[in-house]
């Protein structure tokens, strides 16, 4: 009996060791690699989850969610007032108009009219940044970042686009809701980003 218990304990230790070893490994989805950590305005973030966005039968992009603390529910992710990042890796060319329409639809589906009106100026500033990017191509990386000091920032292929947008966490949560909201654009992707779903 003692020998069996020792073997079970050894197996458990091995499983734990492997789990720890693989926890910090990069995650590759299609052609896009997500590092286990990201730095946003000096804050170290951890990859919370990542997945694939499909529309009809087409693979559109991959998405990764980086947070300061793990979140398994959308409310947990949105309650954090620390830095955060949503990274998109494009798997096909998308026109500027289509991209902005998708953002608008995702925000409107999850934001009450009064709350949308309260941040209308910030939302228009975000649309303006996206218009300045223009059409996006296969392989492009778009980051939607948030930090309490700067607000919401957008990067294209690791280069900043325009200036940071204020509006505090309200604007960024409106962006997060596109993928994490109760009416998220892709339920399967939402579950991957949260590693469980709501």
Predicted region positions:
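Bacterial N-terminal signal peptides
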Residues: 9-19
């Amino acid at each position: 009996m003692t020998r069996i218990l020792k073997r079970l304990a050894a197996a458990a230790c091995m499983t734990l060791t492997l789990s720890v070893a693989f926890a910090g490994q990069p995650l590759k989805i299609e052609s896009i690699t997500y590092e286990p950590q990201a730095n946003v305005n000096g804050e170290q973030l951890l990859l919370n989850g990542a997945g694939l966005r499909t529309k009809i039968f087409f693979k559109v992009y991959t998405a990764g969610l980086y947070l300061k603390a793990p979140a398994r529910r959308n409310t947990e992710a949105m309650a954090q007032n620390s830095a955060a990042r949503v990274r998109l890796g494009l798997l096909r060319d998308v026109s500027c108009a289509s991209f902005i329409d998708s953002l608008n639809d995702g925000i409107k589906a999850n934001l009450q009219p009064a709350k949308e009106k309260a941040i209308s100026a910030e939302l228009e500033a975000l649309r303006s940044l996206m218009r300045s990017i223009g059409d996006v191509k296969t392989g492009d990386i778009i980051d939607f970042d948030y930090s309490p000091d700067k607000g919401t920032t957008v990067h294209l292929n690791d280069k900043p686009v325009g200036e940071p947008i204020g509006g505090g966490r309200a604007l960024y949560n409106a962006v997060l809701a596109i993928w994490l909201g109760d009416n998220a654009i892709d339920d399967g992707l939402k579950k991957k980003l949260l590693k469980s779903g709501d």
